[in-house]
Amino acid sequence: MTDRWDPSIPEHKHLAHQIEIGNGIPEMRPIQKARDALVNVGFEILHEEDLAERPDEVPWYYPLEGDVFKAQTVWDIFTCWRTSSSGKFVSHHGLKLLETFGVVPKGTWDVCETLKIAGDALVKTGQQKLFTPMYLVISKKPLEG
C-alpha cells in the first residue's frame, strides 16, 4: 500500500481487506514498512520510486477496469471486455452454468466471485493511488569495514 493509504480511514482499510481476501494475501503492508525493514537490517536505500506515478496515458490497472477503449492490442480488447459489466455477466453466468452441469469443478464460480472482488478493489485503489504493484527500491548493504 502506498504512503497515501491510511488504515485509520475505514474505506482504505476495507479496500485493502478486499485485495487480501481476493488475492490470498495475509496482510497488505504499507511501503513505509518495507523501507523500515530495509534500514533495520542494514541496507542503504539508494533509490526508491513508485513506477505507477510516472506519467502514462494508460494506468497499470487498465485491464481490470473493463474499458475496451484503453486496449493496447487486439488481444487486449478481449482482456478488457472480460472485466467490463457485460463481460463479467457473460463469464460469471456462463461459469455458473458450466458448474451446474459438472463441466467445471464445484466451487469454481465462488473462486471467480472472489477474484472479481479483488479486481474491483485493485482498480479503486489504483485510481486513488492507494496501492501499487510497481514499487521499485534499489538498495545496497554496506561492506563491513
Question: Locations of the language-model features?
Answer:
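Conserved beta-strand signature within the Rossmann-like core of class I S-adenosyl-L-methionine
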Residues: 1-4
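Substrate-binding/catalytic lobe of Class I Rossmann-like enzymes that use SAM or dcSAM, i.e.
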Residues: 8-134, 138-145
